[in-house]
Amino acid sequence: MTDFPRIGFVGLGNMGGPMCLRLLAAGYPVTAFDLNPEAMARATAAGARAASSAADCAAGSDIFLTSLPRPDHVETVMAGEQGALARLKKGSLWIDLTTNRKEMVEAFAAQAPSGVSVVDAPVTGAVDGARNGKLTLFVGGSAPDFARAEAVLRHLGMVIHCGPLGTGNVVKLVTNQLWFIYAAAIGEGFATGLANGVELGTLWHAIQNSVGDSFVVRHDAPSIFAGHYDPSFSLDLCLKDLRLIQELNRNVRAALPMTVAAEGVFALAASRYGAAAAELHVVKRIEDDAALSMRLKGDWVPPWEQ
């Protein structure tokens, strides 16, 4: 274990917690921090050392990882003289796994202490991907920094070098842009089929074996069928990502109406069911308005239990 770099890990939520556990299982010495005592207890039970703060976690790390819900959380953790960024030692590497603003990551890299490297590495693949090491990680950074990060991140899933610092977040947000559009569209497609006499199981099978197939069809539709709508990701976080996507879209000199429409229907779902409601309530809104049921019998194991 002495040959392994010392890992600091801040943010042990739905995604960060399983990622931290995978690094522990791979043999890395991990120091962890989270404001949630239960999350900390799970990490320490698996062998992590408990840090007293995010800054304390950063101070002894060779590689420091953050996995936080929103950019403002990253700013709270990293910024200022007492923040984690200032405590990173020369030669260390900060890997931000948060879906973040490109400009924020670039600004923190410019402020980093001498000899500290930074990469952005937001992830996709949901909670089950985090648990099973089947995430996709989009990394932005220099070639040497990517190589160093990849040696650790490969224990979490497929690692893709997207280009210079910040491009990891651009790619992640593009993938989410497509997910939001498709998540909204699948509810409309199911509603059209049901309202015109097609049985839901037949419709789902047909879509999976057609040009309409997608990750959403295979991975997320069962959460609709089960009726829990996947509470591992909230409408509030969907809208946060959609706002970040719209910031990127300001650089596109064309109208992008599908993204605008997706943001609108997610906002409508949040206004009706609450910001904390599960992400696929964007489909429940269609069910409720159309008086249709999209329940389908089956052994639908929730993604966070897979």
Language-model-detected regions and their locations in the chain:
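Rossmann-fold NAD(P) dinucleotide-binding segment
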Residues: 54-117
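Interdomain hinge/lid region at the active-site interface
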Residues: 165, 169, 213-215, 219-281, ...
